[in-house]
Amino acid sequence: MELKGKKVLVAGLGVSGIALCKVLDSLKAKVIAYDEKEYDVLKENLEEIKSLSIDFRFGKFKKEFLEGVDLVVLSPGVPTDSDIVKTAQEKKIELLGEVEFAYRFSKAPIYAITGTNGKTTTTSLLGEMFKNTGRKVYVAGNIGYPLIYAVMEAAEGDFIVAEISSFQLETIKEFKPKISCIINITPDHLDRHKTFENYRDIKGRIFENQREDEYTVLNYDDPVTWSLKNKAKCRVFPFSRKSLLENGAYIKDGSIYISVNGNAEKIIDIEEIYIPGEHNLENALAASSVAYLSGISADVIANTLKTFKGVEHRIEFVDEINGVKFYNDSKGTNPDASIKAIQALKTPIVLIAGGYDKGSEFDEFVKAFNGKVKKLILIGQTAKKIRDTARKYSYPEDDILFAGTLEEAVKKAYESAKEGDSVLLSPACASWDMFRNFEERGRIFKKAVAELRR
């Protein structure tokens, strides 16, 4: 893609947008960087690119921003029904999403993971499996390292393992992974995608350009994910925690097996997998399937599963103070993710929840408390909504507390906990009402826990 001298507008100046600006500048494009937020809000983000030859635009979108523009590249956070997208379409300006743009530069094969929950763990785990073969691998995408950096650095013999979100899949055109995987699909981001059916179909786009000789790995146990198999033109490889499969990854006699064309091979005993929880077994099956289909040996897969310690902000053990354990699950940004965190812990729980309202319902989340959640500390925009749902299911009013900050929530949680309890931050909501992202929320939680020792 020749971009020298072309006028390119990057819409959205988060992590991906900043990366796009840097790469486009290095390709000698004339870059316009635009965000609807004002400069003061973005000042910190812009430090990296303020010395480059970039023309900045901030605030409410104006049609003249697109004057003479050859290409618009969208960051994932920019909705496809925004004014900038509509105007670019009216003016017939080429419009590419960040992932689609990056894909067009890729020399290395991309192994793409999506799903509502477990994406980051599965992507990181698969990345470790590739790394343990001794080959050069880049772990990128929605996981924090922008895909555009990975494709620019990766050579032909390297591998790219990418976590891909629904926001990123919404704008693909030719994007075609070597192997794709959908871990699960439960309601999320309905504020953006409007209906669950639309969200499901966007997730299914991950394999829409794959050919007959390529694979998509799908969760056999999740009816919504498995229903997408009929849309696939490529081969479908299932994984299951509950059923024995003639062809696929499955559990038999307490061990993971993978069978390809009827030839089954034992991978590992479940008790040897380092990361705990049923949801992590699902992640292990998904990552192992992609790795095995990529030609990685059962030994390498097993050794990785024995040593991989999980990811930051996902049921991450933080500390134990006076017999009370603290877990950071800031990555629990929807009810289903937080249900899995509650199920993974075996002790009584003091739960810190609440945050930005994405339009989620909290009925199943509250039902999962099931005698395990002894106190509920609520923060953020959804605090009252979760409280009202808890009341509906007769959760004791006296066991619900409110906190104005996360630091206050941590103090209240510690005061409410006894020896043998766990304090779990698993908000079931996004972080954007109080924090820049879930990582910042998780770091503030860990800092607040450390303060308890002072």
UniProtKB/Swiss-Prot annotation:
| Source taxon at top rank | Bacteria
Q: Which GO terms describe its cellular component?
A: cytoplasm
Chief localization: cytoplasm
User: Which one GO biological process term can you cite for this protein?
Assistant: peptidoglycan biosynthetic process
**Enzyme Commission number, as recorded:** 6.3.2.9
* Catalysis: reaction(s): UDP-N-acetyl-alpha-D-muramoyl-L-alanine + D-glutamate + ATP = UDP-N-acetyl-alpha-D-muramoyl-L-alanyl-D-glutamate + ADP + phosphate + H(+)
Q: Where in the cell is it found?
A: Cytoplasm
| UniProt binding sites for ATP | 115-121
Please state the pathway this protein functions in, per its UniProt record.
Answer: Cell wall biogenesis; peptidoglycan biosynthesis
Extract one GO molecular function annotation from the record. Answer: UDP-N-acetylmuramoylalanine-D-glutamate ligase activity
Keyword annotations for this protein?
A: ATP-binding, Cell cycle, Cell division, Cell shape, Cell wall biogenesis/degradation, Cytoplasm, Ligase, Nucleotide-binding, Peptidoglycan synthesis
What is its biological role? Cell wall formation. Catalyzes the addition of glutamate to the nucleotide precursor UDP-N-acetylmuramoyl-L-alanine (UMA).
Protein family (similarity comment): Belongs to the MurCDEF family.
Q: This protein is called what?
A: UDP-N-acetylmuramoylalanine--D-glutamate ligase
